[in-house]
Swiss-Prot record:
Entry protein name: Cysteine-rich receptor-like protein kinase 26
Record gene name: CRK26
Modified residue annotations for Phosphothreonine: 510
UniProt cross-references to Pfam families, sorted A to Z: PK_Tyr_Ser-Thr, Stress-antifung
Class of this enzyme: transferase
Chain sites annotated for binding ATP: 350-358, 372
Catalytic function, reaction form: L-seryl-[protein] + ATP = O-phospho-L-seryl-[protein] + ADP + H(+); L-threonyl-[protein] + ATP = O-phospho-L-threonyl-[protein] + ADP + H(+)
Phosphoserine: residues carrying this PTM: 473
Gene Ontology cellular component terms for the protein in this record: membrane
Keyword Repeat set for record: yes
Lineage start: Eukaryota, Viridiplantae, Streptophyta, Embryophyta, Tracheophyta
Length: 665
């Protein structure tokens, strides 16, 4: 494969040498000193460098909007980037990456800066900028030609066009990019074309206000100019008497844009921001060719690397036959763990599952740990031990349980985890006494934390992973009630597109949380975890288990109960009675989470949202949610035991409670 690619790669590099000179030039940039400056090698500089380096590997996002933060506290770098709604995804990511690199060279010491390109905008700051309307700083790009006809006719046509686009953009919804284009008949037999766009993190009202402010600036910045851009951090608008955007159906984000028309040859543009004037790149054709060649090279390289990566992952999965785990720095002596747990005494036993028991331990330095000791006669447990260790050792996220190390001695297999004092989520939400500690704010925090942990597994980690056993007993809570996903013994690597399903004849997990297509047909994908997450959300809200659920009207399971009440307009019947007595109770937010939960358990796999969409819906309270379709009704009162079953054979079952564990299996 590599031998076939090398000649083509060489040719592409040679062609690139002749086209690289035509790189796009930013329309304008502003370096702000309001929030202070930084120096080289400081924490802020390091975080900014990490942020800029990550831009070239952004995941494809259909709305072209990214909110990324790196670092902590005062040295945290927050960024927002957005592409114009008619820009293809490949071009979008390239534009953002280029904008980031360019901005740090133009603003080398400022902690806050923004840059505008024709196809994207990028900004960063050490303050919070997400979910905030910002109309300053602003800039405008204008043509040099004036309209020479009747002023009143021009202004009437232009205002009518932009006001109409503004009204549509402010209600079109975040999933549609808040991007609208349109045209109208202008004076002197001309057609006026317009474009408006808001960032999707602001509300409908803020979008409308931002665009209104932009329209109000036109008389002072762009009076009678035949073609202008007016841009701020939260929105932008543009107009011209020619089609300057790629025509797309804004009701269909996936539609393919056509080739844009070119403006008149004698049209030039200038930038106005204070006393600044900056020209717009003229070599558009050469720049486009350069970008196309670079994109082609990247595509070929990605294909090659993905083939190599799949081979490496297959090799790593086959390494279970090798007893020697190379990460010696994480290895504990068996005697150390034996002493820490008082020889695995009953007093220190925290719980037990199908593959062994979990014990609390204290190391000689006072550090508390949780030790998972696999059963000596469980061959399947040995396989799970290696699988879990090799996977979890590579994962680092605040919403995943932290693996501290392992121990192998003779037939002994042990995993060492951080100790979490509040044990597992099921001990709280299913207990009427402990449930009093879970106010709505805490439950919402847990829902959001689990969602972000799953997003990391599905999309942001080095290895894309399906958990396959997400449930309340596998969500551990630290002293601040921060949720941490545990139990990766059932997890699987998944290095292909998330819309594609895999098949297995080994069904593992817990009934009530398992997606029907997985239980009945052995199909699993990232949407399998999404289904489990939806069940968990409904359990957190109701304080009831999906499996074995019962209510006054005796409906079979929690999902059925939630769906029926949703359709009847009384979804709040689902809510835990304890919550309704608490000061933090918020019916609007609870209704929103019920909606999200039902979206996640929809019967059709393709209609379930990705975890990236779920996190966006949870973080963006103004995002309009779609109406859920019929859920996958699936009612079982038993759980699959930790001994897995095969399709076509009777599954060994055990009581639901006996399958819950305090720490990962």
């Amino acid at each position: 494969m590599l031998s076939l690619l090398l000649p083509l790669i060489s040719l592409l590099f040679q062609i690139q040498c002749f086209t690289v000179k035509s790189q796009p030039v930013p329309l304008n940039q502003i370096c702000s000193n309001v929030t202070g400056n930084f120096t080289v090698n400081t924490p802020y500089a390091v975080n900014l460098d990490r942020l800029i380096s990550s831009l070239s590997s952004l995941r494809r996002n259909v709305n072209g909007f990214y909110n990324i933060s790196v670092g902590d506290s005062d040295e945290k770098v927050n960024s927002i980037s957005q592409c114009r709604g008619d820009v293809k995804l490949e071009v979008c990511i390239n534009c953002i990456a280029m904008a980031g690199k360019r901005l740090v060279t133009l603003c080398p010491v400022q902690k806050e800066a923004i840059i505008w390109y024709d196809k994207c905008t990028f900004r960063y700051s050490n303050r919070t900028i997400f979910n905030r309307l910002e109309i300053s700083p602003h800039t405008s790009i204008t043509g040099t030609r004036n309209f020479t006809g009747d002023r009143d006719s021009w202004e009437k046509s232009l205002r009518g066009l932009l006001e109409g686009l503004k009204n549509r953009a402010s209600v079109i919804g975040r999933s549609k990019k808040n991007f609208v284009v349109g045209e109208t008949s202008g004076p002197s037999f001309q057609t006026l074309f317009g474009l408006v766009q808001c960032t999707p993190d602001i509300s409908e009202e803020d979008c409308s206000y931002c665009l209104s402010q932009g329209i109000a600036k036109i008389p002072s910045c762009c009076d009678m100019k035949m073609g202008s851009y007016v841009m701020s951090p939260s929105c932008m608008l543009a107009y011209a008497p020619w089609r300057f955007y790629d025509p797309v159906d804004t009701d269909d984000p996936s539609s393919v844009p056509a080739t844009p028309s070119r403006p008149p040859k004698n049209e030039t543009r200038s930038v106005t921001q204070g006393d600044k004037n900056r020209g717009v790149p003229k070599a558009l054709i050469f720049a486009s060719a350069s970008v196309a060649i670079v994109v082609l090279f990247i595509v070929l390289l990605v294909v090659f690397l993905k083939l190599r990566r799949k081979e490496n992952i297959r090799n790593s999965e086959n390494k279970h036959e090798n007893e020697n785990i190379s990460t010696d720095s994480m290895k504990f002596d068996f005697s150390v763990l034996q002493d820490a747990t008082s020889h695995f005494s009953l007093e220190n036993k925290l719980g037990e599952g199908g593959f062994g028991a979990v014990y609390k331990g204290v190391l000689s330095d006072g550090q508390k740990i949780a030790v998972k000791r696999l059963s000596k006669n469980a061959q399947q447990g040995e396989t799970e031990f290696k699988n879990e260790f090799l996977l979890v050792a590579k994962l680092q996220h605040r919403n995943l349980v932290k693996l501290l190390g392992y121990s192998i001695e003779g037939t002994e297999r042990l995993l060492v985890y951080e100790f979490l004092p509040h044990t597992s989520l099921d001990k709280f939400i299913f207990d009427p006494i402990q449930g009093n500690e879970l106010e709505w704010e805490i439950r919402y925090k847990i829902i959001g934390g689990v969602a972000r942990g799953l997003l990391y597994l599905h999309q942001d980690s080095r290895l894309r992973i399906i958990h396959r056993d997400l449930k309340a007993s596998n969500i551990l809570l630290d002293e601040e009630m921060t949720p941490k996903i545990a139990d990766f013994g059932m997890a699987r690597l998944f290095d292909i597109d998330h819309t594609t399903q895999r098949y297995t004849n080994r069904i593992v997990g817990t009934f009530g949380y398992m997606a029907p297509e997985y239980v009945m047909h052995g199909q699993f994908s990232f949407k399998t975890d999404v289904y489990s997450f939806g069940v968990l959300v409904l359990e957190i809200i109701s304080g009831k288990k999906n499996s074995g659920f019962s209510s006054e009207d005796s409906m079979g399971d929690l999902i059925s109960f939630a769906w029926r009440n949703w359709k009847e307009g009384v979804a709040l019947n689902l809510v835990d009675k304890i919550l309704m007595t608490m000061s933090s109770y918020s019916s609007n937010m609870i209704m929103r989470c019920i909606n999200i939960g039902l979206l996640c358990v929809q019967e059709k796999v393709a209609e379930r949202p990705s975890m990236a969409s779920v996190v966006l819906m949870l973080d963006g309270h103004t995002i309009a949610l779609s109406e859920p379709s019929k859920p996958a009704f699936f009612s079982h009162s038993n759980a699959v035991s930790d001994s897995s079953s095969s399709l076509g054979h009777n599954a060994k079952t055990s009581n639901y409670n006996s399958n819950t564990e305090l720490y990962p299996r």
